[in-house]
Every structure is written in structure tokens, then in C-alpha cells.
């Protein structure tokens, strides 16, 4: 298997005007502690340190770490960690938020890490637009797994010409808001099994025919290919009742 090279998928937003437009879409204040995924050349980092209490910028490229340090000489409220985000360990205590323009080719891995391996209350991420839409698609396992832990929204579509070099596709600014109640480990394993069988249309492994009809009726589902997350949760709850 070829090793993923994060550096090969780096596209930067450098225009102050475009950066300001994006920053105005997110909610940050002077009390916030932020982890930034991919400091790049420090263009967003420079805005984050002005608005937040403290910024921890994680950047895999040592040369870009130095570029960012030189850009932030007048600011004491930051640290740069030269590390691979997929190997980085987020703290499990104290409230914090995450911001990042993440590489398209490892977007799934990064988002899974944020949702399942961090305790971030809110994450603002710039991702490929098609990927953002797939995160809202309840016919996909990734979306259903994430929605159990976070609320997902698209805040803005970001045109490809904002980036240099210009990618072939548009991007989106999304927000992941942590739900108040974290799913217990045992419950999550049962939920994961349900999700995978549902997405693979293995309904007969989840319900008897009679149970399935009752579960669909209770959730008010008339088209199993077009359901809301709330309806999916209703199905899962019915599954738990039928299976003790």
C-alpha cells in the first residue's frame, strides 16, 4: 500500500480578504483554546492568535513550522507542534475547539480522529465540498457513525479560486458540534454493528419482517432510502427493544 503524503495535497488560502470572510463564519472568543490542524504558512494561525486565548498549531512540515513562527513573532499565546495530526494525541480534559483546513486525501481519517479521539466541543473544518455533502448523507456509514456523536452542518461553500494552487473542486466550511451525551462504549459497538448492516441493506439480520414493519411505522419512514438521522435513531431504538 502506498503511504499517504500529506504534503502532496496542500492548498493554501492566502488572501486576507478571503481569510476574513471565512473567520467571520465561525464563533470564537478570547477565552477559547484552539488546536489548529495544519498551520501551513500561518495565515489562519495569525488570525486565530488575535481572537483566542491560546492556539496550538499542529504542522507536519518542519519548514512550514518555521514560516509560521516567523509570522507570529509578536504573539506569545501559541505553540507550534511539528507532528503528524494522525499521530497527535489530543487532550482528554479542559474545553477546547479545533480549526483546520484539512488535506482532501486524509479527510475521513482526520474527522474520525476528531470525533472519536478528541474531546473538542466544536470543530470548524475546511474540507472538499463533495465530502462535506457526504457527511450529511444518511445512506452512508461514516455519516451515521459521526452523527451519533456530533451535529454536522455546512456553514459556507468555499470557491476553489480561494486556494493556491487552485484545486479542481470547491471546498466547504463545516462545523461539528459535540452532543451533550457521549455514547457508551458498549452502546457504540452495538450501534456500529447496526449501522453497517443497515447500510449494506442486511435488514433481515436486524429485524424479522413483522419487526421491520413495526419499526418503520413507529419511525414514520415511508422511503428507507430517504430518512433523517432522528428516524434512524428510532430504528436503532426499536432494534434494541426487539433484541433485549
Swiss-Prot record:
One of its GO terms (cellular component) is cytosol. PROSITE patterns: RRNA_A_DIMETH (PS01131), SAM_RNA_A_N6_MT (PS51689). Its EC number is 2.1.1.-. GO terms for biological process: response to antibiotic. Gene3D superfamilies: Ribosomal RNA adenine dimethylase-like, domain 2, Vaccinia Virus protein VP39. The keyword ATP-binding does not apply. Keywords: Antibiotic resistance, Methyltransferase, RNA-binding, S-adenosyl-L-methionine, Transferase. InterPro entries: KsgA/Erm (IPR001737), rRNA_Ade_diMease-like_C (IPR023165), rRNA_Ade_Mease_Trfase_CS (IPR020596), rRNA_Ade_methylase_Trfase_N (IPR020598), SAM-dependent_MTases_sf (IPR029063). Belongs to the class I-like SAM-binding methyltransferase superfamily. rRNA adenine N(6)-methyltransferase family. This is rRNA adenine N-6-methyltransferase. It comes from Lysinibacillus sphaericus (Bacillus sphaericus).
